[in-house]
Amino acid sequence: MGLVVSAAASCGRLRRSRSRSPPPAVLDPSQSPLSLEREAEPELIRVFRCFDTDGDGLISAAEMREFYGCSVDEAEEMVAAADRDGDGFVSIEELRAVMEGGGLDALRAAFDEYDEDGNGVITAEELRRALRRLNLDGMDLTAEQCAEIVAAVDSDGDGVISFDEFKAMMSKQA
């Protein structure tokens, strides 16, 4: 479920051309029984709506697959990791638990999705392939653009993104 972390950063760049049903009333912050602080609530709802494309108030494996462009097995695995009540879906409460409690584990899982060869760093080419898999707004960055992103995040100048640099970048996005 670690990919949820990257969703929070990328959600605003998703294709906006999808027709969307109005969100269920439970997602209205003024009516929500959720205990999240008011300032955090809108971000949670925004991320949840990015996943919940049919507006039924639940995230299915199919919606997870559509969002990430991953395999059926990967999508089912992500849903299962967050699905605390065992109904086969991720509710907004379950997503909140992942976003609040999954912190470091979720970041590590997101980092590992980018680090294709498992060597502990993300190269510009790994970044480029990961962004293609996510297919954000049809974005297809050049190798040079990905190298610029790596350089901007690479605080120690070794030409790659370490996990610590990834954590720092994600905390700035939050």
From Swiss-Prot:
Presence of keyword Repeat: yes
Region of interest (Disordered), ranges: 14-35
Binding site for Ca(2+) 1: D52, D54, D56, E63
Lipid-bearing positions (N-myristoyl glycine): G2
Residues making up the signal peptide according to the UniProt record: none
Family annotation (Pfam families): EF-hand_1, EF-hand_5, EF-hand_7
Binding-site residues for Ca(2+) 4, renumbered to this chain: D154, D156, D158, E165
Encoding gene, per UniProt annotation: CML20
UniProt-listed InterPro entries: EF-hand-dom_pair, EF_Hand_1_Ca_BS, EF_hand_dom, EF_hand_pair_protein_CML-like
Residues that bind Ca(2+) 3: D115, D117, N119, E126
UniProt name for this protein: Probable calcium-binding protein CML20
EF-hand domain location: 39-74, 75-100, 102-137, 141-174
Primary role: Potential calcium sensor.
Domain of life the protein comes from: Eukaryota
Annotated GO MF terms: calcium ion binding
Binding residues annotated for Ca(2+) 2, in chain numbering: D83, D85, D87, E94
Keyword Calcium attached: yes
Protein source organism: Oryza sativa subsp. japonica
Keywords: Calcium, Lipoprotein, Metal-binding, Myristate, Repeat
